[in-house]
Amino acid sequence: MFCEHPHVFTYGSSADLDTNLKCDPAKVGAELVKVNRGGDITYHGPGQLVAYPILNLLAKHGGNGPADMQAYVHSVEQLVIDTLTQLGVKNAGRFNGFPGVWIEPNSVTPKKICAIGVRVSRGRTMHGFALNVSTDMTFMREHIVPCGIADYAVTSLLEEGIDV
């Protein structure tokens, strides 16, 4: 399922709102919603493509154990990287230690362009990814610390010179 949300901040079970929420959401025209995924706070809003793949995941090594979450996240990242490459983004990739898709991940100034937050229950995926297309980045830069990552910037396709 693909969608574009109205202004909303969502946060998962490991969120540190005292540190990473820097505004009163109502005062900036956004909702604040707790969701049943891991991770910290993120923003969804106009100009952002959000995808919620609903899939049955295979168990690790083909057995009857838990789903291979790491392989799933890796495949979602690769899907986004391949799509960005087709759109003309030449420097998208993975940034070691941080999920999602990044621009110039091997530079001293990597920028996150796509957040990924998933959960698996009974072998089925929930939640997904959020790709910043023409997003108002003010919501991420001034109102929250996106995904609890203060040391690195966020960006959008539009800011990277890609107008789709």
Each model region followed by its residue ranges:
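A hydrophobic, small-residue-rich beta->alpha segment in the mid-to-C-terminal subdomain
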Residues: 135-164
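A generic structural motif
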Residues: 56-61, 122, 160-164
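Short conserved catalytic/interaction loops centered on acidic-Pro-aromatic/His motifs
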Residues: 91-94, 126-127, 138-144
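Histidine/acidic-rich helix-loop-helix segments that form or flank divalent-metal centers
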Residues: 113-116, 121
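N-terminal lobe of the biotin/lipoate ligase/transferase fold
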Residues: 1-110
